[in-house]
From Swiss-Prot:
Similarity comment: Belongs to the ThiC family.
UniProt name for this protein: Phosphomethylpyrimidine synthase
Chain positions recorded as substrate binding sites: N226, M255, Y284, H320, S340, R341, G342, D381, G382, L383, R384, E420, Y447
Signal peptide annotation: none
Catalytic reactions on record: 5-amino-1-(5-phospho-beta-D-ribosyl)imidazole + S-adenosyl-L-methionine = 4-amino-2-methyl-5-(phosphooxymethyl)pyrimidine + CO + 5'-deoxyadenosine + formate + L-methionine + 3 H(+)
EC identifiers of the protein: 4.1.99.17
Cofactor, how bound (note): Binds 1 [4Fe-4S] cluster per subunit. The cluster is coordinated with 3 cysteines and an exchangeable S-adenosyl-L-methionine.
Positions that bind Zn(2+): H424, H488
Task of the protein: Catalyzes the synthesis of the hydroxymethylpyrimidine phosphate (HMP-P) moiety of thiamine from aminoimidazole ribotide (AIR) in a radical S-adenosyl-L-methionine (SAM)-dependent reaction.
Species this chain originates from: Albidiferax ferrireducens (strain ATCC BAA-621 / DSM 15236 / T118) (Rhodoferax ferrireducens)
Name of the encoding gene: thiC
A single BP term in Gene Ontology: thiamine biosynthetic process
Keyword Metal-binding: yes
Pfam families from the UniProt entry: ThiC-associated, ThiC_Rad_SAM
Amino acid sequence: MNAPDKFSQLMSLTREPLPASRKIYVPGTQADIQVPMREIMQSNGEAVVVYDTSGPYTDPNANIDVRQGLPSVRSPWIESRGDTESYTGRTPFALDDGLKNGDSESLASLRVQAAGLQRTPRRAKAGANVSQMHYARSGIITPEMEYVAIRENQKLAWMEQYLGNAEREARLAGNSFGANIPKIMTPEFVRDEVARGRAIIPANINHPEVEPMVIGRNFLVKINANIGNSAVTSSIEEEVEKLVWSMRWGADTVMDLSTGRNIHTTRDWILRNSPVPIGTVPIYQALEKVGGVAEDLTWAIFRDTLIEQAEQGVDYFTVHAGVRLAFIHLTANRMTGIVSRGGSIMAKWCIAHHKENFIYSHFDEMTEILKAYDVSYSLGDGLRPGSGADANDEAQFAELRTLGELTQQAWQQDVQVMIEGPGHVPMHMVQANMTEQLKACHEAPFYTLGPLTTDIAPGYDHITSGIGAAMIGWFGTAMLCYVTPKEHLGLPDRDDVKVGIITYKIAAHVADVAKGHPGVRARDDALSKARFEFRWMDQFNLSLDPDTARNFHDETLPKDSSKVAHFCSMCGPKFCSMKISQEVRDYAKTRGVSEEQALQSGMQTKSEEFRLAGGEMYIPISPA
């Protein structure tokens, strides 16, 4: 990183706690299980506790040096299991960073600046399996499993005041479409879900900085944000800052999709400074190593890239193993052909050599590599539809069925798997995608890009996809990959990233509410209560984006006095429905009658006024 001071400048905002918030840590059964959450203090003295993905960056007591990386959360747990070993690891090459000349001054400078981020890699001892799935199937509850159980519950106690009305709870009960969501998440439930393959805990043993999280149909819906440099834009500083910015607003995982130079070094900075799981698409870096010529790719180059990234600590790999030679012709009559970058790379290789996809052919060998580091599979949908016209066609579902077969192959070695999904799908076809995935992929977690429900809104595809994301999240998708306003148009900047994340946090939340996930609606009720009581600052602070909520309010009512006013700019002081409703309640309370009786009394009073005024609908106004 060639400008640490620039990075510090970029990071200034992301180190501040969100308004009225403080970091709290909920302890587990052993001293080193400390699960971070965000506590939002309200002006009425009540506290709301919410899931927090921001890591130590919003903890003012945390000392962070990005040149050294974050402190380790999991190292003691990994070492105590006694099934891993440290080893020298592969030697980084200039080609890993997209450079042909190992003596390049820029490369040397990059390596010096990243020296504090280097770690000795670990791997499974000979004959051992270090995956969370293997432990789960062996009946072992790991600290990671206990950690995510605590995290998923979000400190249930504060929610009770909002969930105690039995009539309301019955009326608002969700529909989980066959999911099995318990009222309280226990470590044993987490273990069982991971053992069954219905959930994954992406946590490479070489990413000890990660704060464990779980992805599965029976847990909170998660969201992923994409970052990454390209050959034409962005720097390492910008990508690391974008990582921290993404986590601040709620990204549960982040994918590094870098395709330009300095890929390896950028990944060092990202992994060592990330408390959330990091995913990659290894074929992107492998392609850089062969000068961008897909036909020159080989299994040996791809295998070396997998090991390189596993040693660095990547938590999940997107691999396009389902793009088989026999399926490529199915895309010939599509409106938009093959739109997946990784899918098109593998399709081109298959056609050029007229051979089966080497990722598919070497799948078991690849699984052996992932097993040694506990890297999870994210089986890529290389034949996903790139337009509504191509949704749910045979190319898409032929690949999906193959991914289901590969899932079972991976499970034979206890390697964790999630399945990637579309894409572009009209609303009336969204549920069929979830139904087909559950059937073909044996309930492995589904991870979808949207889907976008219409193709007519470039510049607003965060909205077109947010609609599909909310729907498919309700139907059972475990993680939603965000889409920004720049989708199809360009690389997103930090503002686009924030808009995309907030859009998808909304989609994930409404899906959880619709599924009837225990307790999630309590935050809605807390904000509604604050709104009804005109606690403006609490409204802002309880929202997903306090800054924007406050700014929008202040555009029309900027004075501090407006933040205690019992009205807003929409209706004004005389026509505020909530103010009128409160006045009815106050009237009833002072007279010792019910609200219904107060309303009836008011109606009788107004009726008498109408009669005394002559009983006419329109009363002429006398000239002054």
